[in-house]
Amino acid sequence: MSATMAEYQSSTSRRYDTQIHRRVTRTVNVGGVLIGSDHPVRVQSMINEDTLDVEGATAGIRRLHEAGCEIVRLTVPSLGHAKAVGEICQRLRETYQPVPLVADVHHNGMKIALEVANHVDKVRINPGLFVFDKADPDRTEFSGEEIASIRERIAENFEPLVTRLKQQDKALRIGVNHGSLAERMLFAYGDTPLGMVESAMEFVRICDSLDFHNIVISMKASRAPVMLAAYRLMADTMDQEGFNYPLHLGVTEAGDGDYGRIKSTAGIATLLAEGLGDTIRVSLTEAPEKEIPVCYSILQSIGLRKTMVEYISCPSCGRTLFNLEEVVQKVRDSTSHLVGLDIAVMGCIVNGPGEMADADYGYVGKGPGVISLYRGRDEIRKVSESEGVDALIQLIKDDGRWVDPP
């Protein structure tokens, strides 16, 4: 038997809720950009220039920031690179503006992290590589004493970085990668989401012991199912232990083209819809600035941020009274610079008015060569198809919702 409306409305389950209820997370400040559940889901990316190329890296950061990237990461594999970051920050101040920067530090990066922490707003470390020991092919197990010794060495090397970040009120990302778990984690947990979570929690607990909480956590994998499981388990584990750190979402090494975008969306949007995630990156094998529109499209498609026009259009059928694809493109070309509007382009009046009822404006086929313009649910006027796009623009202008393109 179908549920009654009263039963539906009284249900406490969020499974049927049209709103996304974000997991409550603390606020982390990254160069003035606030990450956490009280703030918009943030968009990040990473330059692909060599950090030693100060001018090239500065230009890459600027391109990303101008494209809408809110936090930019750059690789710092050596002390020389760490010092170059200071020059990059200076060049940004001189030629553009300060941009929130994250330094990516990997293999045995203790000294590198301490140096670059003086320049950037956040340091990202990989728990599997921060204190790195080459895998021993002859090893069959780790003794309890060996594990304790490794943990002691990790704490000894990690604490100075935590102390510096705390003193400077800067942030840390504990960024686990599925493909680079430490050997002892692989022995203990296998190549699993649990191993990823335990890798992160080891560092989280050290931070907690030092009363440092300006932390963001990521659980990246190149396969979406692994990434999904790891983030869910990480959130559950933090909840059980009383931690509420923000999550940085991403499918690493997603590839390029349509499939890379689809693969990233499958992982990122799924978690966002579950309320997990406070900042995202879509990793594509393309120019970094091409990642940014994908991020904003994901966020808009599930209602977390609105930064562009939302276009609603039917797939076309035998009832369509004009070239729908051509008209949609004309409308998009004329209005894509606007922010916050919903515009529907529907091929006929059979389903058009109902399916576009939530739109701010509608363009609907009325008859051969004739279209109707709508404001919300109200039909405003009929015009010839040749005048349709211009008349739609005029209607938006009449309502005071038009701005000229930049």
From Swiss-Prot:
Its cofactor is [4Fe-4S] cluster. Pathway: Isoprenoid biosynthesis; isopentenyl diphosphate biosynthesis via DXP pathway; isopentenyl diphosphate from 1-deoxy-D-xylulose 5-phosphate: step 5/6. Binds 1 [4Fe-4S] cluster. GO terms for biological process: isopentenyl diphosphate biosynthetic process, methylerythritol 4-phosphate pathway; terpenoid biosynthetic process. GO terms for molecular function: 4 iron, 4 sulfur cluster binding; 4-hydroxy-3-methylbut-2-en-1-yl diphosphate synthase activity (ferredoxin); iron ion binding. Pfam families: GcpE (PF04551). InterPro entries: Dihydropteroate_synth-like_sf (IPR011005), IspG_bac (IPR016425), IspG_bac-typ (IPR004588), NO2/SO3_Rdtase_4Fe4S_sf (IPR045854). It comes from the Bacteria. It catalyses: (2E)-4-hydroxy-3-methylbut-2-enyl diphosphate + 2 oxidized [2Fe-2S]-[ferredoxin] + H2O = 2-C-methyl-D-erythritol 2,4-cyclic diphosphate + 2 reduced [2Fe-2S]-[ferredoxin] + H(+). Keywords: 4Fe-4S, Iron, Iron-sulfur, Isoprene biosynthesis, Metal-binding, Oxidoreductase. [4Fe-4S] cluster binds at C314, C317, C348, E355. Its EC number is 1.17.7.1. The keyword 4Fe-4S applies. Converts 2C-methyl-D-erythritol 2,4-cyclodiphosphate (ME-2,4cPP) into 1-hydroxy-2-methyl-2-(E)-butenyl 4-diphosphate. PANTHER family: 4-HYDROXY-3-METHYLBUT-2-EN-1-YL DIPHOSPHATE SYNTHASE, 4-HYDROXY-3-METHYLBUT-2-EN-1-YL DIPHOSPHATE SYNTHASE (FERREDOXIN), CHLOROPLASTIC. Belongs to the IspG family. This is 4-hydroxy-3-methylbut-2-en-1-yl diphosphate synthase (ferredoxin).
